[in-house]
Amino acid sequence: MSTDARGAADPPRGRDGRAPDPLRVGGWSPMRMYRDDEPVDFVIVGTGAGGGTLACRLAEHGYSVVALDAGAWWRPLEEFASDESHQRKLFWTDERICDGANPLTLGTNNSGRAIGGSTVHFAMVSLRFRPEWFRSRSALGYGVDWPLDWREMWRYYREVEQALKISGPVRYPWGPARPRYPYRAHELNAAALVLARGAEAMGIDWTPTPLATLSAPRGRAHPCVYRGFCIAGCATNAKQSALVTWIPRAVAAGAEVRDLAMALRIEAAGDRVTGVHYRRDGRTHFQRARNVVVAGYAIETPRLLLLSANGRHPQGLANSSGLVGRYLMAQLNQASWGTMDDEVRWYKGPPSLALTEHWNYADDGKDFFGGYCWMSQGPLPIEWARKLAARGLWGDALKREMARYNFQAGLKIVGETLPRADNRVTLADERDAFGLPVARVTYAYDDNDRRMIRHAFAQMDRSLEAAGARDIWHEDDDTCHLAGTVRMGSDPATSVVDADCRSWDIPNLWICDGSVFPTVGGVNPSLTIQAIACRTADRIRTLAARGDAHARARWR
């Protein structure tokens, strides 16, 4: 490992027939290499919850796979620090233009730049969709129906939960009965107990949060030590990110993963794509492929499709419907904060150890469509100081409030937003370091969002007050997970991809990430993205076996 002029360590590189082993200090694993001019079955752009999972499952099905990612390949045991500022290296901080009535804040909790994508810094909350959300128009009267059946998705949820060894409660209080989680639930910290006391006082159910972080040993990975820096990268590998789960499996099965490889444009000839142009090590390359999968998430996926416009596809690839970039959904993430009489020390452990989904499953007593859950919180000190500064606290006032840090508690929602065509991603006039137009992200809340926010604040305030909190205040303009922009559906006129995540326009172009969501639900999306990726891999194998997909499995 080399260092730059400041003494900062450069990340290890996947090259020369080997890949960094994230589970061993200084470790390496053998990795198959492909030539750029050697057509592989699949080139995948992105290695997060969608692309990393799909790379693993396709390679295990016997296909030749090259996965490209703009981010670095880290070994968490030696390269992740207990330092919020240092770990900003995991975020996608490239320039984007954000406008609209409610411009989004991008670059931290809703995007990632690393092998493993944003799963490297996600909060590990792993929740299934409510079954009715897959047919929200038919069953609940809003949004659109998915082209997927919830019972099939339930099987893939189980596959992902087993693959990640999700730690969760013996019985989950909402939805259809399900098997026990693979690992026991984590011990609750004091912040989670605040949520529990408040929910019980309100007479609503709560539960320990199902988390993709280990509560017991798994091979060379240690269980969670309650270090508390989960959203800044897990230094012990307890977090079951794509970096330490799907990616090592993909490499072992014969996939090549190329780090620091920025996709520039997808090449198309007629009604087929032929590969991906990308920038790596100061040179532009072209990887030939029989199929291209885009898995760059809800901003970079539509951006790449739009950047790849040509004479035959002047609006961008897969965009005959004109819907690429449209129907962006940013889940609501408002919070109620308060001060407790006793110390909470909310930084101890994963940030969301308890939750309630009561308002996801209760359809009465609401003046809005959709639902939300709320979770216990544990912001780190710098993040908390930023929140206080945003309230206008500076100087001595900020110091006094920070002195109460260990006595704080809070609840935060993940709330469903409705798909609106005007919330969208387009290309701006400004250009990035590669000379490409940056993404313009236009976003606005609607009346349904505002009604949900008011309802959530009223309920969370009741819960905090019942738990003994005082000096309650609101963080009222925040969003989290992104979805939509390349929606799936049953009609090529109203969607971009079909149920198998395959472009309606170009049969060897696939999209596999949260951008395919027609609706977003009121829970974290990572489990659903990974379940869709597992399903897509199986569907590709089925389609290829009957000659409907251009790929040839080779058992290694």
PLM segments and residue spans:
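A glycine-rich dinucleotide-binding beta-alpha-beta segment and adjacent secondary-structure elements
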Residues: P208-S215, G219, P223-A232, N237, ...
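FAD cofactor-binding and catalytic pocket of flavoenzymes
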Residues: L104-N109, W146-W150, S321-T442, D447, ...
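Conserved redox-cofactor binding core of oxidoreductases
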Residues: R137-A263, H481, R487
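Glycine-rich loop(s) and the adjacent beta-strand/alpha-helix scaffold that form part
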Residues: R57-E60, S64, G71-A81, T236, ...
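Redox-cofactor-proximal catalytic regions of oxidoreductases
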Residues: S85-W174, C234, R345-K348, V414, ...
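Extreme N-terminal leader/targeting segments of oxidoreductases
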Residues: S2-F42, E60-H61, T542-R556
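N-terminal Rossmann-like FAD-binding beta1-loop-alpha1 element of flavoenzymes
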Residues: F42-A67
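A conserved FAD-binding loop/helix module that cradles the flavin
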Residues: T519-D538
